[in-house]
Amino acid sequence: NIFSSPTLKDREIALAALETVGIRHLANRPCTMLSGGEWQLTLIARALAQEPRIMILDEPTSHLDMGNQVRILRVVRSLAEKGLAIIMASHFPDHAFIAATETAILDRGHMVHKGRPDEVITAEHLETAYGIVVKVLRIGEGVDRKACFPTLQDSARSATGADNTG
């Protein structure tokens, strides 16, 4: 019942979930003593303890520093590689290149592009979505992935009022 204490099996499941996301060492730390990234990993572990087939993440990297963003994205990618279906919302198109096999761009609640990240996260699509000029470049030097770089220019569409950013 909902008022009972966790069983040994419950504790084992919780510890396994903490291990999966790489924070088993935080098992006994009070939640008030966790960083933002540790807290976010704890929330993902809590969801994993329910043994879901699908996990929906709404901006799991928001308000996190770069290091914790990468840690979260690595966990997301690892869980997906193990077969967990993940639906993740993000305002950072780069995240699709790091953690997605399929991605979509939504505009005013409507899906306007869907497919592999290389097909969807393009300069043209991002310019239309955000109303600014965005460069999508392949980064080498040991990284070998694409990244998005917003310029400081409004798109020509934005200047004429023809963008979709409403």
Regions found by a protein language model. Give the residues of each.
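Conserved catalytic motifs of ABC-family nucleotide-binding domains
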Residues: 51
